[in-house]
Regions:
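Conserved, single-site charged/polar hotspot
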Residues: 2-503
Length: 503
């Protein structure tokens, strides 16, 4: 591992040298778009859901929410009162908001199987079993506690985490002037379709009173319609079909894995967000190719035994893929994103463009793919004063004037896992991919080397994103070379099972 990391560091460091020539000129090979609709191998069926599930997506907040409505519509309030209205639009604003109820739990153990959770609990009759998520997971817990601090202070030898869970949303009264009425929160709006902030939505809209933001707007819809609204925002619809299929399966897997489970979602009246904290969703689109790839992979997810794969993805890995161990996925291994079985070495990384890597394609690749390939190698100049300001504003830490930085830990892929920032008033250590990148000026990735130049740090690195899971540019180039989506997925996620969990 140390030797591999050393190779990566040397390779990135040599990006400082002048132009490097490989000597031989390679024959230009044109790419072809692969549109094969052949059947996938090794798919099993496991009826996790008797029918296609629904998902609730948080899409808006504010003191006033305006929704365009299309077709015959109906609104139902929290007490069951129904009002019909014709298309046009409605405006919702809060009249009265009452406090929501959040309870806090100490998590002792987690199970995928309900029967195993029940057996475990038999030895602890005072414990509770919490069922969470669209794809349910069962948590044996102690509680509830009224205050988070109480749960945090509670000591137990098997304590895994503290969950803050929404027991009852804020309620109150909501005004809709177009209907000349006031209704009890939450309200459910049913129409043929909706418009909100220049996007079109299917399913139904839910509006909740909320004591912090005033209102929360939630789009509740069928799961496959949700995936159709995710894929074109996470991967260009111009990408090859097999790459888009891989993206659809990854997006479906990721959503089911985190929906209603990810810690910051437990306090909300929805399953997932519409931004990058889960995955980007912008509602209904008119891309036929997206509809086709989602429908052709309907219900398909990646699983390892009874659990979902860690189906994360990102734009470009810089030629080096991160392992998934720290996220709990041992199938995802650190390796080169190359077409041969190659060890990462100085020969691969000392030039700015190397077509040995899937994420560094030839110039003849489609323009949209070369756009993503542009982050294969990058450079950024950040002032020491800017780093100090980031620490003060975003980390609530003041170490005075920043003088230098020092890398304390790298992963096997070469990514920085821990950095020490040195100032006139002290030192501060930052851990983790996202926080390291954020603290040093929002770097594209943590795969970098640097040098100090006066009052600046010059970073030179590779890739865009965390590096765990599927490299989207690499997936596109593999598809252009004829790879099928199942092969793309197994390269990036390991020996996963492709399982259809509903018809």
């Amino acid at each position: 591992m140390r030797l591999r990391t050393r190779f990566i560091l040397i390779g990135l460091a040599l990006l400082y040298v002048s132009c490097f020539s490989t000597g031989k000129r390679r024959e230009k090979v044109e790419f072809e778009r692969v549109e094969d609709e052949g059947k996938v191998n090794y798919v099993e069926f496991k009826e996790v859901f008797p029918e296609e599930p629904e998902i609730k997506v948080g899409i808006g907040r504010g003191r006033e929410i305006k929704i365009k409505t299309f077709g015959k519509c109906e609104v139902v309030d929290g007490e069951g009162k129904k009002l019909g209205f014709s298309e046009g639009g409605i405006t919702v604003s809060p009249v009265e908001i009452r406090k929501k109820l959040i309870k806090h739990w100490v998590i002792i153990e987690r199970f995928l199987d309900r029967e195993k959770a029940i057996v475990y609990k038999m030895a602890y009759p005072d414990y509770q079993i919490l069922k969470l998520g669209i794809y349910p997971r069962y948590f044996v817990a102690i509680g509830p506690f009224d205050k988070f601090e109480e749960a945090l202070r509670f000591k137990h030898p098997n304590k895994k985490a503290v969950f803050s869970i929404l027991e009852k949303p804020s309620d109150g009264k909501l005004r809709i002037p177009e209907l000349k009425t006031t209704l009890i929160s939450p309200i459910e709006i049913l129409c043929d379709s909706f418009g909100y902030k220049n996007n079109k939505y299917l399913g139904k809209m839910l509006v909740f009173a909320d004591e912090e933001s005033g209102l929360i707007l939630v789009n509740s819809l069928k799961f496959e319609d949700y995936i159709k609204g995710v894929v074109p925002w996470e991967m260009s619809a111009s990408y090859p079909v097999e790459a888009l299929k891989a993206q659809a399966i990854a997006a479906r897997t990721h959503a089911l894995d985190v929906a209603g489970i990810k810690w910051h979602l437990l306090k909300e009246p929805y399953d997932v967000t519409n931004d990058f904290t889960t995955q980007v969703y912008r509602g209904f689109t008119n891309y036929r190719v997206i509809d086709s790839v989602v429908e052709s992979t309907r219900g398909l997810v990646m699983m390892s035994g009874d659990r979902f794969s860690i189906a994360t993805f990102f734009m470009n890995c810089g030629g080096s893929l991160e392992g998934g161990e720290e996220w709990g996925d041992t199938l995802i291994k650190p390796k080169a994103d190359a077409f041969q079985d190659l060890e990462l070495s100085v020969e691969m990384l000392k030039i700015k463009k190397d077509t040995s890597f899937a994420c560094s394609p030839r110039d003849s690749a489609p323009r949209i793919i070369n756009y993503g390939a542009g982050s294969f190698r990058w450079e950024k100049k950040v002032s020491l004063s800017e780093i100090g300001e980031i620490l003060r504003k975003e980390f609530n830490v003041d170490i005075g004037m920043v003088k230098d930085i020092k890398v304390l830990k790298r992963s096997a892929s070469g990514r920085v896992k821990e950095v020490e920032i040195i100032g006139t008033k002290g030192k501060y250590r930052v851990k983790g991919d996202w926080d390291v990148r954020r603290s040093l000026g929002n770097l594209k990735s943590s795969l970098f080397v640097f040098k100090k130049s006066g009052n600046f740090i010059i970073f030179r690195g590779g890739g865009w994103g965390h590096g765990i899971g599927m490299c989207q540019v690499g997936a596109a180039v593999r598809a252009l070379k004829g790879w099928k989506y199942e092969d793309i997925l197994r390269f990036y996620y390991g020996n996963v099972d492709l399982v259809r969990i509903y018809r």
